Structure formats: structure tokens, C-alpha cells
């Protein structure tokens, strides 16, 4: 881990304290007064792109009693109008780490669940996020850790597909399922179907759209103004996932896009926890991956990066 050049500082976020982690390649801002939330991620070289994350306005209204705020958050799945939207407005327990920070919210009164997030800088362009849900209630809870990253609009997302098989060579069975939500319209130009990936042209979404997938190479990417954000969470073979088996989901409404990964479903007894790990990468200078050639370049870059994590 090459973290000796990481800087750790504090700043204000909407009247509350936040922590800033800075390397040569990026600056990350994490709230400590509410959340846990990662509210900003900027590239040093790609400063034109600004904050890659969506930031809701200061006068944001609550959504089902919950401030979305923007950025990256931890929820518990399956989605429920009461359980999922518990407010996270209280100050956090904060533990500084040599290469990052660990954060934990107070236990949610209505669910008995406590959310925690550990953020570690692995090198100048790589982050490791460990999400945890702990059951402090009186009975077992079936749930999954759900890591959602809200990225600002104007860009292009890619979801790689599994390698193609050959019918002639005896590949007779399916390898994954595509799971659209009830409001998803697959005829819209927001979806770009390619042989090796699905492209999502965010500005072309004029209403809420969402789909999930039951198996994929474990990474997704979002390109905006020359900066590419990648998140990686490998699929656990044989595990049962929420939402008809989805370890990955994507939501967009044209103003933003959410790249979402999930842990397997688990039944948490009182005192038990489930963890879910994502790795993030920030890359500059790659082309918009809307063509097969540009996607191939992105996939090669991401492949090398993933190998460096092991």
C-alpha cells in the first residue's frame, strides 16, 4: 500500500464537520456529522469534471423522511419504504486510520441495524470501502448490505457482460438474467446494447429507469468529462442475492446515475454483522467508452487495475 503521500484534513460540509482524504490523483470528502456519506470525489488531473458525485441542493426536501444528500451511501436491501429510508442525521463515531477513516452511525431505532463504513486509501488512485451492517435488535433480520453511488449527470456508464460462449461448442445453458424494474422502458435510447457491454447514456434518460443483473465481471464504470470512475465488487458464486438474484443494479433519471452493488442476502442474528467490500478507481484520459474500441481500452485498463488489487 503506497499511502505515504495521502493527506488527511478536515473541512465544513453544510454546517457540519467532514474529513478530506487527498492523494496526487484525487480528493475525497466524507461527512462525520451525518451519514456515513462520501459526498465528494474529484480528480486532480481532471479538474474540469469537478465533483464526480451528485450533490443535492442545500434546500433539499426529505424523500420518505430521508435526505438523499447525494454521493455514496450504505442502505439495507430489499428496499422497503419504512426500513430503507431511516434518517441518518446524527453525528458518527469516528476512528482515524493511518490510511483512511472508519465511521459508524448510531443504531437505527426502528430496525435495530447499525451502519458502518471503513474507507482506506490503497494507492494514489485506489480506495477500498468496507461496508458493515450489524444487528443490535432482539430478533434475526434477513437483509443485504447495499452500496449506492450517486454520480452526477452528463456522462456515460458501462456495464461489462460475461464472455460469450459458443453454441457449436456445446454452450447450451444461460449465464445470467437481466432484471428490469416495473418502470423500465428498454426501447429508450438511454440503453446502448453492445456485444460485450451495456452502455447507459445518462442525458437521454427523461424519467426513472432501473435494471439489475444476476452475474457480471464484477465492475462497472462511469465516464464524465475525461474522468472515469470504476467500482469493483466481485460476485460471490453460489450466493443468494436480493431482487431476483442481483449483485449489481443501476438507476438513472437523466439528472444522475446510481451504480449499486449488493452483498448476498443473510439472516443476521442479534449481534451478527454482514460486510460488503467495494474497490474504487479513478482514471484520467480514457475515451468515452461508447464504442467497442473505447470500451476495449477501458476494459484492459480495469483488468490490470483489478489484478493489482490481489
Model-predicted regions and their roles:
Residues 1-310:
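Surface-exposed acidic/polar loop and edge beta-strand patches at domain peripheries
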